[in-house]
């Protein structure tokens, strides 16, 4: 008798788990196209997840980097962009542990007409991005860091080669 009850409860739990999995798959498929940032083409070309945002008519290529704490805009392009300087300076630590003080700006960017507002550290990335330009012909303008992903609840899906919002 108890064995039968445990068996029935187990079947019910498995059915509920299966229903939740199916529901999650359906929800994932309903993410609006504007909320899906594809990086398939750039991954094929450069082996890096790069997404093109816009500010007005200007296209801006950003490397998606969840390992970077903050978003960064290349210092060499900042004067061409609309931005609001923050009232503070912050520190940035390079891969080798070197510490530098950098300006911080607030910028509006769009992806397929969806607006995003974020804080960007202003840092000279010419040397790093110059290698990408000469090797792959891709001109990078900045890095989208984990602060952006957390703020806008974006996840990266390497199976689908997209970043998508779970909001």
Where are these regions (language model features)?
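Pepsin/retropepsin-fold aspartyl endopeptidases
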Residues: 1-167
């Amino acid at each position: 008798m108890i064995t039968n009850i445990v068996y029935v409860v187990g079947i019910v739990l498995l059915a509920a788990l299966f229903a939740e999995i199916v529901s999650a798959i359906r929800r994932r498929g309903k993410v609006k196209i504007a909320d899906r940032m594809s990086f398939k083409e750039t991954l094929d070309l450069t082996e890096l997840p790069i997404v093109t945002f816009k500010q007005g008519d200007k296209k801006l290529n950003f490397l998606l980097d969840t390992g970077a704490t903050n978003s960064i805009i290349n210092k060499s392009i900042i004067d061409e962009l609309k931005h609001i300087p923050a009232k503070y300076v912050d520190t940035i630590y390079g891969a080798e542990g070197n510490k530098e003080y950098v300006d911080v700006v607030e910028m509006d960017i769009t992806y397929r007409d969806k607006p995003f507002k974020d804080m960007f550290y202003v840092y000279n990335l010419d040397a790093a991005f110059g290698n990408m330009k000469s090797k792959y012909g891709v001109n990078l303008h900045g890095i989208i860091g984990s602060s952006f992903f957390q703020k806008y609840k974006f996840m990266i899906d390497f199976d689908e080669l997209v970043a998508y919002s779970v909001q």
